[in-house]
């Protein structure tokens, strides 16, 4: 159904730069996220009359409660969205609202960029709908300002319609999800729910309880620099070591060659000189055994290269980042089945697929709160071609309301 102020909320949130900073050491990593929580979201929660509204300086989460209004609905359910946006220009976001999209090319402001169905066939799913796009110079921030707007709108609808009976609802708006550390300090005891949902998915119907298991691999290659004219038998080129290491990884296990349940090894950066070079990889897989095998392959290649040179030419550090939340959620599929049933009741076809990435729910699930992910509507996220459908956002609100009112 249509909801007053949903579009207005989203546009207002989207215009605020809340980009996170992977190089910062504070929590949240940017002051703009703190300001967004305290100056925008907290007053709105207060105006809605929620209880126990508090901002946790320890982790950057803004938390609030809407008490149950029916003693028979005893569940305590959480909804979580993140405040930060991805690593793309977020200053001066100027959304475009395209009403009754006709299926054609959408110019992104005067930037010279276009949303073209020839490049983005997913646009054909939205003919006749209201689309919100960028002006071509920034991202949109539907990931995850759409989720925040949907949660806020659901709360406002429940407060305005007390005849709708619902369980206790806890909401959490957190920082730094896009750089993978948003849930590191999540306070499970403070949030105090039976289960939760991240409202951080993509198109209509997405319902996800599987993520990658993830690790980061950092390598330092140690060379020996001598004059190239007399280098024979003496020079060890650290850049060549980095290339040799990379070439020993399976060539087919790259992101651009994988999909579905296939994992990958992704070389993110390679820098250096003859004397020293650095490579950074991310390692991703869904299954524990193959995840461990991937990490073991990295170690085996490093060991083999060091053995061949008779000394340490390759230093390798691997750090696990998060794990497939399926390991937790599949022990009790009730949160997934509940969301699935609500979607079906609303005529929405659930699209249950693995997330080829991670969510805050990955870590929160392992902390003790099962937290699958539901759609928020964003498409082509993290860049200038990002867009979201107002009608999909409305249906996300419908799903939230259905979940909290389901007996």
Swiss-Prot record:
It catalyses: Release of the N-terminal residue from a tripeptide. InterPro entries: ArgE/DapE_CS, Bact_exopeptidase_dim_dom, Peptidase_M20, Peptidase_M20_dimer, Peptidase_M20B. CDD domains: M20_peptT. Its main location: cytoplasm. GO terms for biological process: peptide catabolic process; proteolysis. It is an enzyme of class 3 (hydrolase). It comes from Streptococcus thermophilus (strain ATCC BAA-250 / LMG 18311). The lineage of its organism: Bacteria, Bacillati, Bacillota, Bacilli, Lactobacillales. Transmembrane segments: none annotated. This is Peptidase T. Its EC number is 3.4.11.4. The gene is pepT. It is found in: Cytoplasm. Gene3D superfamilies: 3.30.70.360, Zn peptidases. Keywords: Aminopeptidase, Cytoplasm, Hydrolase, Metal-binding, Metalloprotease, Protease, Zinc. Belongs to the peptidase M20B family. Pfam families: M20_dimer, Peptidase_M20. Zn(2+) 1 binds at residues 82, 143, 200. The keyword Zinc applies. One of its GO terms (molecular function) is tripeptide aminopeptidase activity. One of its GO terms (cellular component) is cytosol.
């Amino acid at each position: 159904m249509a909801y007053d102020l949903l579009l207005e909320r989203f546009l207002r949130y989207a215009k605020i730069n809340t980009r996170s900073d992977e190089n910062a050491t504070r929590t949240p990593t940017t002051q703009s996220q703190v300001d967004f929580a305290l100056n925008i979201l907290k007053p709105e929660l207060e105006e809605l009359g929620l209880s126990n509204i508090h901002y946790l300086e320890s982790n950057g989460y803004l938390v609030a409660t809407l008490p149950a209004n029916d003693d028979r609905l005893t569940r305590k359910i959480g909804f979580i969205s993140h405040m930060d946006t991805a690593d793309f220009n977020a200053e001066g976001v100027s959304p475009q609202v395209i009403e009754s999209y006709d299926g054609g090319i959408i110019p992104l402001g005067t930037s010279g960029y276009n949303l073209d169905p020839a490049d983005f066939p997913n646009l054909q799913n939205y003919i006749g709908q209201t689309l919100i796009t960028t002006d071509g110079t920034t991202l949109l921030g539907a990931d995850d300002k759409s989720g925040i707007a949907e949660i806020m709108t659901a709360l406002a609808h429940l407060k305005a319609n007390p005849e709708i009976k619902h369980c206790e609802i806890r909401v959490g708006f957190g920082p730094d999800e896009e750089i993978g550390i948003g849930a590191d300090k999540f306070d499970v005891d403070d949030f105090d729910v039976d289960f939760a949902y991240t409202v951080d998915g993509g198109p209509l119907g997405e319902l996800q309880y599987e993520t990658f298991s993830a690790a980061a691999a950092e390598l330092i290659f140690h060379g020996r620099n001598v004059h190239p004219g007399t280098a024979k038998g003496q020079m060890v080129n650290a850049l060549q070591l980095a290339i040799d290491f990379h070439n020993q990884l399976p060539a087919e296990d790259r992101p651009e060659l994988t999909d579905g349940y296939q994992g990958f090894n992704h070389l993110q950066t390679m820098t250096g000189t003859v004397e020293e070079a650095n490579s950074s990889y991310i390692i991703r897989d869904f299954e524990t055994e193959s995840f461990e095998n991937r990490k073991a392959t990295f170690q085996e290649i490093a060991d083999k290269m060091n053995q061949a040179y008779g000394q340490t030419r390759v230093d390798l550090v691997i750090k696990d980042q998060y794990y497939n939340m399926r390991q937790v959620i599949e022990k009790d599929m009730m949160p997934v089945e509940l969301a699935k049933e609500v979607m079906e009741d609303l005529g929405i076809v659930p699209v249950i697929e693995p997330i080829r990435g991670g969510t805050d729910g990955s870590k929160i699930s392992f902390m003790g709160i099962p937290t699958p992910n539901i759609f928020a509507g964003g498409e082509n996220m993290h860049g200038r071609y990002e867009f979201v459908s107002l009608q999909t956002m409305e249906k996300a609100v419908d799903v939230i309301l259905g979940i909290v009112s389901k007996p």
